[in-house]
Amino acid sequence: METTVGTLGENTTNTFTDFFSARDGSGAETSPLPFTFSYGDYDMPSDEEEDVTNSRTFFAAKIVIGMALVGIMLVCGIGNFIFITALARYKKLRNLTNLLIANLAISDFLVAIVCCPFEMDYYVVRQLSWEHGHVLCASVNYLRTVSLYVSTNALLAIAIDRYLAIVHPLRPRMKCQTAAGLIFLVWSVSILIAIPAAYFTTETVLVIVESQEKIFCGQIWPVDQQFYYRSYFLLVFGLEFVGPVIAMTLCYARVSRELWFKAVPGFQTEQIRRRLRCRRRTVLGLVCVLSAYVLCWAPFYGFTIVRDFFPSVFVKEKHYLTAFYVVECIAMSNSMINTLCFVTVRNNTSKYLKRILRLQWRASPSGSKASADLDLRTTGIPATEEVDCIRLK
């Protein structure tokens, strides 16, 4: 299911014989997806075309997509559930950075348990055919888009939080009301920006070969609104990729300068050295998260820019759709990296998994305090200095 679609000019009527042709319920042929169109704008040839879903290339891509979706469901579903449960169970884990990570965990968890099963059915089982109705088509696309923007905004908020904590340590930390407002902003901005994704998402019958049809599920913008689509895409590209990446890079560059290249005045006690090592590990982990985010999402945005602003590049490419879905799957896999970095790698999730399976939600009265302290020491999260470096601030 595509989350963005491109646009075509009026002079491209007869250039799509290698793509799917689409038609509405009345039988009027239209321009091929995934480019935007309005029904009846194009007079497509009715030649029988090859079903690309039967090619070896698509078969290989289907295996890759299936493995990625299974990985997302397992890693993001289980890992984020355990982290959210731990955060709800242990109050000492509820600092600002962990709360910001929780927003990212919630969004990835929802995608893993709600969106990925439908996408597995769409991509792998039915091979690019949607059979679940318009409402679910729009809902799944919308939820996945909101999750992407929540993840981006949460990562940006975490970077700013680390910048303020390390570069300006004497400034007071955020109050509960401010933190709640920041979390509300992360979600509200994401929900609002993603509204067009739901509004323009629809189902369209694709005629692959004679007597064979598939139902496309994705965004379809009318040709007469191509200017608005391009403007919307550039807005999203700037607000939810370029801007956050630049801001996060500047924050971590300034933090790195503070931690590695600035001399610490006075005598360095063991406590100070431990805190410095902890902060450096934190920043290295966050830089890895940022690098993974760029490497996973840059190909997706680059592919989309070429498709939407230079459509002739892909017009004659037989395996265009296969390539796009693979790029999209790589982008979605970024949620697994976030989960592994923030939740699994240094969060001792096996202990919490055993407790959940045994329904041991409460510690014994005599040892509750000691148990909570032990849990706090064994659940360090790379991005959270307050947890990794207990009592050092």
Curated annotation (Swiss-Prot):
Could you say which tissues express the protein in this record?
Widely expressed in peripheral tissues with the highest level in the spleen and moderate levels in the adipose tissues, thymus, lung, kidney, testis, uterus and small intestine.
Query: Gene for this protein?
Result: Prokr1
Q: Give the disulfide map.
A: 137-217
One Gene Ontology term, aspect cellular component: plasma membrane
- Report the record's Gene Ontology biological process terms: cellular response to hormone stimulus; circadian rhythm; G protein-coupled receptor signaling pathway; negative regulation of apoptotic process
Q: Which organism is it from?
A: Rattus norvegicus
Its Gene Ontology molecular function terms?
G protein-coupled receptor activity; neuropeptide Y receptor activity
Protein name according to UniProt: Prokineticin receptor 1
The record's function comment reads:
Receptor for prokineticin 1. Exclusively coupled to the G(q) subclass of heteromeric G proteins. Activation leads to mobilization of calcium, stimulation of phosphoinositide turnover and activation of p44/p42 mitogen-activated protein kinase. May play a role during early pregnancy.
Superkingdom in the source lineage: Eukaryota
